[in-house]
Design a protein with these regions (language model features):
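Extracellular ligand-binding interfaces
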Residues: 8, 494-545
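Chitinase-like catalytic core of GlcNAc-active glycosidases
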Residues: 69-267
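Substrate-binding surface in catalytic domains of secreted glycosidases
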Residues: 183-361
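Extracellular beta-strand ligand-recognition surfaces/modules
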Residues: 493, 537-579
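Conserved aromatic anchor
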Residues: 601-613
Length: 613
């Protein structure tokens, strides 16, 4: 099935609280108990079903900035925060007629997104879709208040653990939820609940893993211990190793409280080997409060092999809350939000090779001096699959807009938000260098080109990539990939030259010889002789045949653009794709439910639920 919320109006309407049902967080057990596969639990259930299987990420040290990071020491990162703002009905990541909605996009620096204001066991389907295509796991949160467990949650957990655990796992698998998350800072004397949750978590992890899910992970805030008491900041030991589980009985990953630095001896791999053999210290997440005020421990983290846990706040994402710091219009807020997340996850320079030394800081609001999460981890990629089964296409669409374009043609001028249609976006954001594959600070071009998303135009969707400035010679590394090419594959670059001039070539390299550009002379995208025309999308296609036949059989490891002789360049990039043959057209959808939600002087709001083969 598919789902859609529509707003046909001159000024789009925000998703109203009564337009779509939110499941109740404490009642997951009741939902699972009533669930019959193939039958709807409630009318809006389809809004919480993911249609995209989680993709598995791959490793290639040659296309990492820091080649010393391996599976054993490359930190994971859980972003345990709300999507948007929970006030005014908690629209979260559900489809919406409001452009100024949160379109998170720096997925390559996140391994799990715990949607803090999504219900326990549920995540909006579109949000799960875009996370899954990028190889990121998702979960909702059981937001149990601190202190003695309430009757509501005691009853809810009792119902949940009283159900066959495998049915819960099947429920999560069906809906595309990759684990269970808990704000576990409650106390309880119920061994039935505690032992039942441990058994449930083990079953969920085992079942989803056996179903081929590469991103399954349950998260437990390290407050409630094995005995139902609250013991923060005690490391891993006899008090919580059953909740954590060993390598043969994987149950949860632990999100450590913010004073984790005080028990470093209890967080080493040797400690993990003692209390949970077969697990990794990277399954322990050093907690950081995005609101600030926690101990400044970033330099300490550099010396310990722990993953990163980011929380904050209860009702809104702190990076989202800062988006109005550079202007109050919706376009200014959206543009600055993308700038902020690029700074936070890459670094203040938004270029991972222009590194900033890690220092201690309790304020986690990014700025030009922020060292970024790229100081601790690689940018990960899921861009590896059989092109005969699925083409690789990016229109650089963020999943929201002030208008909607399709193949360069304006469809309407209504605001919209649907993060589920967000495209694959550049991996490193933005790896500019004077040399192809240049990885050190001396390869940073002073006053070089700039890159950012623009909401002024789009080939498909509501945004595209804007590249602008002047430079003699510079490379922009776009995508970390591992696509095996075949004869007759077609590589497409689509652009609009808004102003200025440049020589631009596509620069590709192959796995095993990543430093060598493959026949750059055969990939001319733009020349200084081309005239600017801000009305025309120009398509350049390159077929794996003739002079480019030597690409057949090679696995493309790097996709980059090479700029030379750029003067006042203003270039919109609307598509990069690699396709193999013609993809079949999907069957027309079968409308299941179509209803008007509201009619008002601004237009009509509606909801459509449909089935597709």
């Amino acid at each position: 099935s598919g789902i859609l919320v529509l707003s046909f109006s001159s000024q789009a309407q925000e998703l109203k609280e009564d337009y779509m049902t939110w499941p109740e967080s404490s009642k997951l057990g009741q939902y699972v108990s009533s669930w019959v596969p193939g039958e709807d639990l409630f009318e809006d259930e389809n809004f919480y079903v993911s249609r995209v299987k989680p993709k598995e990420r791959f490793r290639n040290a040659a296309t990492q900035i820091d080649e010393t990071l391996t599976e054993a020491n490359d930190r994971k990162l859980v972003f345990w925060v709300p999507v948007g703002n929970a006030s005014n009905g908690n629209t979260n990541a559900r489809p919406n007629g409001k452009f100024d909605s949160e379109a998170f996009s720096t997925w390559s620096y996140v391994t799990h997104y715990g949607d803090w204001t999504a219900p326990h066991g549920w995540v909006p389907g579109g949000f799960a879709d875009v996370a899954h295509k990028n190889g990121v796991g998702v979960s909702g949160v059981a937001s149990v208040p601190w202190g003695g467990i309430s009757s509501e949650w005691s009853s809810g957990f009792s119902t949940l653990v009283g159900i066959e655990a495998e049915k819960v796992a099947k429920f999560l698998h069906y809906h595309g939820v990759d684990g269970l998350g808990y704000n576990s800072e409650f106390s309880t004397g119920s061994s039935f609940i505690l032992s039942g949750l441990r058994a449930l978590h083990e079953t969920v992890h085992k079942y989803l893993t056996e179903k081929g899910n590469p991103v399954v992970e349950n998260f437990w805030y390290d407050g409630t211990n094995d005995n139902g008491q609250i013991t923060f900041d005690s490391g891993l030991g006899n008090h919580n190793n059953d909740t954590f589980g060993d390598g043969e009985h994987i149950r949860t990953s632990l999100f450590l409280n913010y004073n984790w630095h005080g028990v470093l001896g209890g967080l080493t791999q040797s400690t993990v080997d003692t209390y949970a053999p077969g697990r990794s210290s990277l399954d322990l997440y050093a907690g950081f409060n995005m609101q600030g005020g926690d101990p400044s421990t970033w330099r300490t983290l550099k010396d310990y092999n722990l993953s990163i846990g980011l929380w904050g706040a209860h009702d809104y994402n702190m990076l989202w809350a800062d988006r109005a710091n550079n202007g109050s219009t919706d376009v200014a807020k959206q543009t600055y939000y993308q700038h902020l997340i690029e700074q936070f996850f890459t670094n203040g320079n938004r270029n991972p090779i222009d590194k900033i030394e890690v220092y201690n800081r309790g304020n986690h609001h990014p700025d030009d001096k922020w060292f970024g999460m790229s100081a601790f981890m690689t940018a990960r990629s899921s861009l590896k699959w059989d092109l005969s089964e699925e083409p690789f296409i990016s229109y650089f669409n963020l999943g929201n807009g002030r208008f909607l374009n399709w193949m360069g043609e304006r469809q309407n001028d209504n605001e919209w938000y649907n993060i589920g249609v967000q495209d694959y976006l550049p991996t490193w954001r933005w790896w500019f260098a004077s040399d192809f594959m240049g990885k050190t600070a001396d390869k940073v071009v002073e006053n070089g080109l700039e890159a950012k998303f623009t909401y002024d135009d789009a080939y498909v969707g509501g945004s595209c990539l804007r590249l602008f400035g002047s430079v003699d010679n510079e490379y922009l590394h776009l995508f970390k990939t591992e696509f095996a090419l075949s004869a007759a594959d077609v590589i497409t670059v689509r652009y609009k030259l808004v102003g200025g001039q440049a020589d631009v070539n596509l620069a590709l390299s192959a796995k095993g010889d990543e430093q060598t550009i493959l026949r750059e002379s055969g990939f001319k995208v733009l020349t200084v002789a081309d005239e600017a025309d801000d009305e025309v999308w120009v398509e350049k296609t390159f077929k794996v045949s003739g002079s480019l036949a030597m690409l057949a059989g090679k696995e493309i490891a790097m996709v980059a653009l090479h700029f030379e002789n750029a003067e006042n360049l203003d270039l919109y990039l609307g598509e990069f794709s690699i396709t193999r043959g013609a993809m079949p057209t999907p069957a027309a959808p079968e409308i299941k439910i179509a209803k008007v939600l509201a009619s008002h002087y601004k237009g009509v709001d509606g909801k459509v639920i449909f089935n597709m083969d």
